[in-house]
């Protein structure tokens, strides 16, 4: 008899796992809907699945928050059934050769600030803001950013909106690479710290790495101390040098906030939206991976033969050549909990992502710039089972320094990294160039162009990691 959960979900293959449980692909036997099923042994030393399920229920209904389908106990396991989502931003960062364009980073920043603001509105801090904990959706929601993993979340105010007290000598909770300065200094976290961590994530996407990655030390505690020292000694100006001043302004604002201050989320979003408009970008949800995936599809599935030049040695479309693996993100990095369960596919480096940032399109007057709108570009990313991610955290290879009375078992974890191979492709391919021009041209919105364009995308294989 096939294994079932809650008498409603069929348990499928394992798609991830780690010290905090195993994640399986599941199917609703009534609707055939695919879901993610996380199992946690009831005898685990620090159970967190029940706590996490309660957090998801508090946040239910929010944009970019996955839905909980079922929670309960089956035999020796606590079980959480939740939405199945697409790849994480860490996965997509690796797919894009570990660098994202300014346009993509700004589109992500807008949604990510919204997600953090919503969590804060519900009186909780996330306390583990990192690329692995933001996933893209599937299908019609492929352009929507989801926030996951509330195992380290903490309530920062009570029902009367009384803020938790300021405290010092706290253990570092979260991921050292993205932890705020005050968190390293042992100060109780508050809303400002989630936002500062997001700033480090955005600079990581733009720069490809952060100055405190790859530091050598004898043990983990010494490594975290070195990360802290490097972070303290790196000024905001040095970190953001060579990038628009809005990023430095973002950090200065976050660090100007007092412990219990309510951040002005609208100001932070406006900073990046004004930059977006000034750069002449269009809020069309065409991310770097959207373009790279389309170009890869042209290599793996060449267009039908026409009465003219054929694809070959003299063609503008070169064959796919796999080169050496890309360097990983740093020695203090840990494999993502998802990476262990999901095989990665060689990513394609079509052209330098810096050049992607220069592709300017007419500025849209559409109010989509202020909303998390899902547009037709989701047809680029048709995820299959092997590329889907559950909306729950699977593992933390953690070192707990000291004890803490908080309910979520505070930990220091190391940030994830991946290494993929590169497939060089000509940017000047007539097929690639024409389709990119369609994306950035005002005429792309016309019905005829979109029909032709979507017809070209039929049968494109989805991202595989």
Curated annotation (Swiss-Prot):
**EC assignment:** 2.7.11.1
Q: Which SUPFAM superfamilies match?
A: Protein kinase-like (PK-like)
Biased composition range(s): Polar residues: 405-428
Annotated Protein kinase domain residues: 9-277
GO-annotated molecular function: ATP binding; protein serine kinase activity; protein serine/threonine kinase activity
Q: Which PROSITE patterns match?
A: PROTEIN_KINASE_ATP, PROTEIN_KINASE_DOM, PROTEIN_KINASE_ST
SMART domains in the record, alphabetically? Answer: S_TKc (SM00220)
* Span list, region Disordered: 300-344, 396-428
First-level EC class: transferase
Record's catalysed reaction(s):
L-seryl-[protein] + ATP = O-phospho-L-seryl-[protein] + ADP + H(+); L-threonyl-[protein] + ATP = O-phospho-L-threonyl-[protein] + ADP + H(+)
Per the record's keyword annotation, is Nucleotide-binding included, yes or no? yes
Q: What is this protein called?
A: Casein kinase 1-like protein 2
Binding annotation for ATP? 15-23, 38
InterPro entries assigned? CK1_Ser-Thr_kinase (IPR050235), Kinase-like_dom_sf (IPR011009), Prot_kinase_dom (IPR000719), Protein_kinase_ATP_BS (IPR017441), Ser/Thr_kinase_AS (IPR008271)
PTM summary from the entry reads: Autophosphorylated.
> Which function does this protein serve?
Casein kinases are operationally defined by their preferential utilization of acidic proteins such as caseins as substrates. It can phosphorylate a large number of proteins.
Q: What does the record note on quaternary structure?
A: Monomer.
Per the record, the major location class is: cytoplasm
Keyword list, A-Z: ATP-binding, Cytoplasm, Kinase, Nucleotide-binding, Nucleus, Serine/threonine-protein kinase, Transferase
Q: Which species does this protein come from?
A: Arabidopsis thaliana (Mouse-ear cress)
């Amino acid at each position: 008899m096939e294994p079932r959960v809650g008498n409603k979900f069929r348990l499928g293959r394992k798609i991830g796992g780690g010290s905090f449980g195993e994640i399986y692909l599941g199917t609703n036997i009534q609707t055939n809907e695919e879901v993610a099923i996380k199992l946690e042994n009831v005898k685990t030393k620090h159970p967190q699945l029940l706590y996490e399920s309660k957090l998801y229920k508090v946040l239910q209904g929010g944009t970019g928050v996955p839905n909980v389908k079922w929670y309960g106990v089956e035999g020796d396991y606590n079980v959480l059934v939740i939405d199945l989502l697409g790849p994480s931003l860490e996965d997509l960062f690796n797919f894009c050769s570990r660098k994202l364009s300014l346009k993509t980073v700004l589109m992500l920043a807008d949604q990510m600030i919204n997600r953090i603001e919503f969590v804060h509105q519900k009186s909780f801090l996330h306390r583990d803001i990192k690329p692995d904990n933001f996933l893209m959706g599937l299908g019609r929601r492929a352009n929507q950013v989801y926030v996951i993993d509330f195992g380290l979340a903490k309530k920062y105010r009570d029902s009367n909106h009384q803020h938790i007290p300021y405290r010092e000598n706290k253990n570092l909770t979260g991921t050292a690479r993205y932890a705020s300065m005050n968190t390293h200094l042992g100060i109780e976290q508050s809303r400002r710290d989630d936002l500062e961590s997001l700033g480090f994530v955005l600079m990581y996407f733009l720069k490809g790495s952060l100055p405190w990655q790859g530091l050598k030390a004898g043990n983990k505690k010494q490594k975290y101390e070195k990360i802290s020292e490097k972070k303290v000694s790196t000024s905001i100006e040095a970190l953001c040098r060579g990038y628009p001043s809005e990023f430095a302004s973002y950090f200065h604002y976050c660090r100007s906030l007092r412990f219990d201050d309510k951040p002005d989320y609208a100001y932070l979003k406006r900073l990046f939206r004004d930059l977006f408009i000034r750069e002449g970008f269009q809020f069309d949800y065409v991310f770097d991976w959207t373009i790279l995936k389309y170009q890869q599809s042209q290599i793996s599935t060449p267009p039908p033969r026409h009465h003219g030049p054929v694809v070959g040695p003299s063609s503008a479309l070169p064959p796919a050549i796999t080169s050496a693996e890309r360097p990983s993100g740093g020695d203090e990095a840990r494999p993502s909990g998802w990476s262990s369960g999901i095989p990665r596919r060689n990513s394609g480096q079509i052209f330098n992502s810096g050049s992607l940032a220069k592709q300017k399109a007419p500025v849209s007057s559409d109010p989509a710039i202020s909303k998390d709108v899902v547009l037709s570009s989701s047809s680029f990313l048709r995820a299959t089972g092997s590329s889907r991610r559950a909306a729950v955290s699977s593992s933390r290879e953690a070192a707990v320094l000291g004890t803490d009375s908080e309910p979520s078992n505070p930990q220091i974890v190391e940030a994830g990294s991946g290494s993929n191979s590169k497939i060089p492709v000509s940017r000047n391919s007539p097929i690639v160039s024409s389709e990119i021009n369609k994306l950035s041209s005002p005429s792309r919105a016309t019905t005829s162009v979109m029909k032709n364009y979507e017809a070209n995308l039929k049968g494109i294989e989805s991202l595989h990691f």
